[in-house]
UniProtKB/Swiss-Prot annotation:
Keywords: DNA damage, DNA recombination, DNA repair. The lineage of its organism: Bacteria, Pseudomonadati, Pseudomonadota, Gammaproteobacteria, Thiotrichales. It comes from the Bacteria. Involved in DNA repair and RecF pathway recombination. HAMAP family: RecO (MF_00201). This is DNA repair protein RecO. One of its GO terms (cellular component) is bacterial nucleoid. The keyword Lyase does not apply. Belongs to the RecO family. The gene is recO. InterPro entries: DNA_rep/recomb_RecO_N, NA-bd_OB-fold, RecO, RecO_C. Gene3D superfamilies: Nucleic acid-binding proteins, Recombination protein O, C-terminal domain. One of its GO terms (biological process) is double-strand break repair.
């Protein structure tokens, strides 16, 4: 019997009359583009934020389409709050835009599943930062805070500027600089982050994600920011 794979739909659109062109996220192969045959009864099954399981026949060519079939429903993670839904859409959009095809992504896949199950209005900012850090690691652009760009250990008593290649020690106070004590928290569990740590780490992941995007725009990020700004008025 052929192996069944768990996966999530990142993006889908209609392809001919009875098929969907999909981008899916898997543990074993990372991101895959493929085709799923559908009918009127099953078409609503293939939506983002739903965990599915099925057989996958990988494309023989790098630019080809895989075939996904014998798909079954596992679990739905549709959230009952708008902020949670936007947060999950943000994760999907990041994976869709940034993740390479056909690379095993066990750690990122497990983090993604954990966040789908546990995100709420209280912890969503923390979990999104955790996801961004894991995604950057998967992209080979991880945030390393052991040393600055000059090879010196990060000092919790100093402040640093964020560069594309790391962190540079500031000789004087500079706007948007990051305290060394907050940078060092990146290596610690999210449960140990303070609100101050979160704000600092958010600046770091924003800078690194923007660098990885190379000018690509995130629709979900804009919606998320606009929604949060409405709450401040």
């Amino acid at each position: 019997m052929q192996q069944l794979y768990d996966f999530y739909i990142l993006h889908q659109c209609k392809y001919k009359e009875n098929s969907l062109l999909v981008s899916i996220f898997t543990r074993e192969f990372g991101k895959i583009s493929g085709l799923i045959r559908v009918n009127k009864k099953t078409i609503n099954l293939y939506q983002p934020l739903v965990k599915l399981r099925g057989q996958i026949s990988l494309a023989k060519k790098s630019d080809g389409l895989s075939k996904i079939y014998n798909v079954e429903f596992v679990e739905s993670f549709y959230q009952n709050t708008y902020i949670n839904l936007l947060s999950l859409q943000y994760m999907n959009e990041l994976i869709y835009l940034l993740l390479s095809y056909s690379h095993e992504e066990e750690f990122l896949f497990e983090k993604y599943g954990f966040i789908l199950k546990n995100i709420n209005e209280i912890n969503y900012k923390y979990l999104l930062r955790m996801f961004e850090l894991e995604l950057l690691d998967s992209l080979g652009q991880g945030v390393y805070v052991d040393c600055d760009i000059d090879g010196m250990l990060i000092d919790e008593s100093l402040s640093y500027s964020i560069l594309a290649t790391g962190f540079k020690k500031n000789l004087s106070t500079i706007p948007n600089s990051i305290a060394g004590k907050n940078l060092l928290k990146i290596n610690q569990s999210v449960s140990l982050w303070t609100d101050e740590d979160l704000k600092a780490i958010s600046k770091v992941t924003r800078a690194y994600i923007d660098y990885a995007l190379a000018g690509k725009q995130l629709r979900s990020r804009k919606l998320l920011i606009d929604y949060l700004n409405l709450g401040k008025k």
